[in-house]
Swiss-Prot record:
Family named by the database record: Belongs to the Caudoviricetes Gad1 anti-defense protein family.
Segments crossing the lipid bilayer: none
Subunit structure: Binds the Gabija complex as an octamer and inhibits its ability to bind and cleave DNA.
Keyword Protein transport found: no
Keyword Aminoacyl-tRNA synthetase: no
Protein name per the record: Gabija anti-defense 1
GO BP terms, alphabetized: symbiont-mediated suppression of host innate immune response
Top-rank lineage group of the source organism: Viruses
Description of the deletion phenotype: Knockout of this gene prevents the phage to overcome the host Gabija defense.
Task performed by this protein: Counteracts the host Gabija antiviral defense system by suppressing the ability of Gabija to cleave DNA.
Keyword terms of this UniProt record: Host-virus interaction, Inhibition of host innate immune response by virus, Viral immunoevasion
Length: 295
């Protein structure tokens, strides 16, 4: 068996997909490495071990061998009834079918045991630090040189970035899932642009009059007094590519996948803290400024 491995300071990674096939069914989950089973990773063709293995074994199930029929005690051996019939089953077409009742089925049982597997290990990479394998749903991009020089399993340790479209989608979905409608709302929500406005409570309600019959020319005006208690201010807008005056999203990036995920989390946390910040107009300056809502 030919294997490839990656040695790190905290583990040893092993795979039997030596040709890097896209669709591949690994057999390593059925084997024992120095007496232990390998731990699965989120990549189905790679497994994690504590160290580079010295012995690989396959568990062989218990099996029954040497099936035969032996003549029961008390019955005489003859040409028609031999002492042993070497067969695992006597069917209707057998010459011994009529005397089958004179025999007991016998066999030997071999217990479960481990069979050593000959293997050849090719350590394709050695890493001084720890390798942290993390699952993700990103479509990662790398520079050409890293793609040429680095094994696919180790690409996640290299600098990476997301496309503008994917970065925009992450931001858009996160805002929609976490916005507090009491303090902000989305006014434009499209694949090509997103706008969020801040909802500010007025320091003093603004009185205004509306004509309920304004749309009916022949009716007398019916006036109603109303009060405006809130106003809206644009706080965030973004687009995946050039569109009108919208700022183009800056793609997420990181020195590796772990750093990328950390950068995405920090950006989204900071953004939502800004969007959901509870602000109201300041009474002291009569709405020229805003302050935190203490309620």
């Amino acid at each position: 068996m030919k294997l490839i491995g990656i040695k790190t300071s905290n583990c040893f990674l092993v795979s039997d997909n030596i040709e890097g096939k896209r669709y591949f069914h690994s057999q390593l989950d059925e084997l024992l490495f120095d007496g232990k089973r390998a731990t699965e990773t989120y990549k189905s063709d790679w497994f994690k071990l504590e160290k580079e293995p010295s012995v690989i074994e396959k568990q062989m199930p218990a099996k029954k061998i040497n099936h035969r029929y032996e003549l029961k005690e008390g019955f005489q051996e003859s040409e028609l009834t031999p002492k042993v019939i070497k067969a695992s089953y006597i069917g209707e077409d057998s010459e011994y079918y009529e005397v089958k009742g004179l025999y007991d089925l016998k066999f030997e049982e071999i217990p479960q045991q481990n069979e050593k597997i000959e293997f050849e290990m090719n350590v394709i990479e050695e890493i001084d630090g720890e390798l942290k394998l993390q699952s993700h749903n990103f479509n990662l991009n790398y520079n050409l040189l890293d793609r040429i020089q680095t094994h696919p399993m180790l690409l996640e340790t290299k600098p990476c970035y997301l496309s503008q479209e994917e970065s925009y989608k992450i931001i858009r979905n996160h805002i929609k899932a976490n916005i507090n409608p009491k303090f902000a709302r989305i006014t434009s929500d499209y694949d090509f642009c997103l706008t969020v406005v801040k909802v500010l409570e007025l320091y003093k309600p603004h009185e205004y009059i509306v004509d309920l019959n304004a749309m009916y020319k022949r009716r007398k005006p019916k006036l109603e007094k109303r009060f405006q208690t809130k106003r809206e201010v644009e706080i965030y807008k973004v687009a995946p590519k050039a569109y009108q005056s919208y700022p183009i999203v800056e793609p997420f990036s990181g020195k590796d996948v772990e750093d990328l995920k950390s950068n995405i989390k920090k950006f989204l946390d900071d953004l939502m803290a800004k969007i959901n910040e509870p602000l109201v107009e300041c009474k002291c300056c009569k709405g020229r400024g805003v302050i935190l809502n203490e309620n």
